[in-house]
Amino acid sequence: MSILVVSHDAGGAEILSCWIKHLKIKEKIIYCLKGPAISIFKRNIGSFENLHEKDIKKIKIKKIITGTSWDSDIEKKIILYGKKNKIFTCSFLDHWNNYLERFTLKKKKVFPDKIIVSDHYAFGIAKKKFKNVPIQLIKNYYKLEVLKKIKLKKNKIIKKILYVAEPIREHAIKQHNNPMYWGYDEFSS
């Protein structure tokens, strides 16, 4: 039996691929990636076979691990597939906003069996939003890799790091019809 990893958006793909790279998973991992996730996984874990979502029914799956995309429904569709087929599902939340929207498919909530977060702030928000879903806090291996790269540049003094992993400009347009609703976007911040 295999573990199926499903991802689309960049933020979740960075965290999920770095997590997989650092784990010693003995089971076979099968990937179903779309969008920016494909190149991110190639950069972080090397070559892999990328399965089309329609071919998932052909394999025996033990567990499904997903990102949580804002701009794609692939993870939600696969979580729903897992639920219907009694396959354990867990999803990585890679940010601090739009939690419920990440699990909404055609106006219905589609929650995994477990939600994984990688910082204490996200853990607190997730505990409040998802009272009936177990929440697990793990190390953020992506953040550790970024910090390691920054430390290699010893000649520069860095006091603060702003990490924007969301296309917040698109979120602001969708939610408020104003790309600069918050006074900044992922490019100007």
Predicted segment positions?
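Nucleotide donor/acceptor-binding cores
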Residues: M1, I158-I161
